Structures are given as structure tokens and as C-alpha cells.
UniProtKB/Swiss-Prot annotation:
The keyword Cell division applies. Induction: Up-regulated by the transcription factor ERF114. It comes from Arabidopsis thaliana (Mouse-ear cress). The keyword Plastid does not apply. Promotes divisions in the guard cells (GCs) after the guard mother cells (GMC) symmetric division. This is Cyclin-D3-3. Transmembrane segments: none annotated. GO terms for biological process: cell division; guard mother cell differentiation; seed development. PANTHER family: CYCLINS.
Amino acid sequence: MALEEEEESQNAPFCVLDGLFCEEESEFHEQVDLCDESVEKFPFLNLGLSDHDMLWDDDELSTLISKQEPCLYDEILDDEFLVLCREKALDWIFKVKSHYGFNSLTALLAVNYFDRFITSRKFQTDKPWMSQLTALACLSLAAKVEEIRVPFLLDFQVEEARYVFEAKTIQRMELLVLSTLDWRMHPVTPISFFDHIIRRYSFKSHHQLEFLSRCESLLLSIIPDSRFLSFSPSVLATAIMVSVIRDLKMCDEAVYQSQLMTLLKVDSEKVNKCYELVLDHSPSKKRMMNWMQQPASPIGVFDASFSSDSSNESWVVSASASVSSSPSSEPLLKRRRVQEQQMRLSSINRMFFDVLSSSPR
């Protein structure tokens, strides 16, 4: 009798939790149905991994959106001198980034510090060294924030630096940048939204790295264009992600863009305007424009046929030379005919072998 009472007391807590278990089970089935529906629309996602973090993700996203810096860069856009200084400074920053192998966020932070600083301080046209010293200080600070190993201050001055500054001068400039920026060295950037979307939607591993790499590469390629200063990080991130999704053909571009704009709470008109500018810098368009600008061949006119790769819309050119009056083109044409004949023979032999192998013995 005592044993039966002890068993009942031990099983009591589990009986109390039976109701909760049933509710969780029904909720689980609903989540599975939602995940199945989402996987059909987005086969590159693995949504089941992040369902339990939805509330935390919503709070994080709201924080990112609220902490965005206001777009107050009209002063740069209206000043040709500042635009030119910015182009030279960013060109040097990206060269040093490649030289030392810094990550993309380091370069982006340096650009953010530089833009915020030059809008708060007046650059004097009679001091051309000022922009390079500012870029040097901003990159040094960004590396200290983001990188594990940071070069010495004197070692930053590589990649055709026009001026060489002492370490004390760079340190004083760093303090001036820090005080001007109110020591706010962790701004919200488009990369913040890239990381959030990848984690929120739980991209499959073989898509995650490629998607992030393409987004960061496209971002760094368009940042030197001062026109993008008029867009917030969330708008810029949305336009870039839609462009990358379009190139990778992961899912329906329109559906993905609609979901992103709803999630990030961005204006569709601004996103479309930014997207048009992003397309001017897209790799596929650049490859096509570079091919169209190539000079005509002196031997003959090339008829090019383009085939678009389904994975990244890369253009592949297969050109065939037309008959020319020049005698030097005859050996080329003869070799081409011989190659075509060999290809036909190999294909016939392959078909003949397939027929023999499939015939009953």
C-alpha cells in the first residue's frame, strides 16, 4: 500500500503536465505545417531551426531599426570637394583592407566613421592631407573594434599613401574622431541586417556563406557611390538582398521583396529607387557592359550568343568568326571544321555504344 502511494506521488507531476504536453504537440503540428508551406516557397531556407527564437528576433530587429543613424549626408552630396575627398579616402581604405585581409565590417565601419566625421567637421581646402589622416584614423579605429590582430599605426600607411604621419599624430586624430562621434563606434550597418535575416530565416549551410559573401561584396562595391548616402541601412540592405536573391534564383523575387519590406518596415518607393541604383553595380550587368564595349575583331565580325547560367546569371559568350577575306583566317576555319567533325563522330559513337549496351543479350 505504501509502495502504491509512493508511485502515485512520483507520477503526479507528470499527470499535471499532461495537458501542457498535448497543447505543445498540437502547436508543434501547426508549426510543421507552416514550415512545410514556407519550404515550398523558399527551398533554400530551413525555417524550423529559428521558430523558438522569434520573440527574441523581433526584439533585436526593432532595436536595429530604432538605432539606425538618420540620413544627414546632404552636405556631402552638395559639396564636390567632399565627394572627391570621400572617393579618394574610400579607395585607399579598400586597398588597405585587401592588403591586410580585414573583414568587410571593418571597412564598412571605417567608411561610417569617415562619413559621420566629415559631416561634423569642416575640411579646409588648403589642407589636402586632412582627408588621408582622417581615413587613416577611422580605419585604425575600425580595426581595433573589429579585428583580432591590428597592425601598428605606422604599418597602416601602405598602398600608395601620399603622406606619412607619425604615430602621435595619428593617435591625436583618433581622439578627435572619437570625441566628434561621441564614442559611438558600433553603428547599425547593412551587414547588421544581413546577419539578422540569415539567422532569422536559418539559411541552409550551402546557401548561407554564398548569400552573405555576395551581399557583402555588392555592398562594398556600391559604398563609394555617394548617391547611396541618402538611404538608410535597412533600405540599402533590402535592395542588396533582393538583388542577390535575383541573381542566385533562390526564390520568387517579388515575394521575397514583399516579405523583407514588411519585416524591416521600409518604404517600398525608397527600396525601388535604391534597387535601381544597385542594379547599375550588379556583377551580371557589369559583365554584359564590358563585353558590349569590347572593340570589334580585325579578323572578322563575331556573332555572340549569350547563355545565362541558372545559378548566378553569369553571361557566357560563344563566338564564331565569320568568313573573312584575309588568308590568315583559313587555317582557323579549317581547324574549327575538323573539331566539329570530331565532335559529331564522338557523339555518333556514344549513341552507338548506348544502343549496344541497351540491347538485350
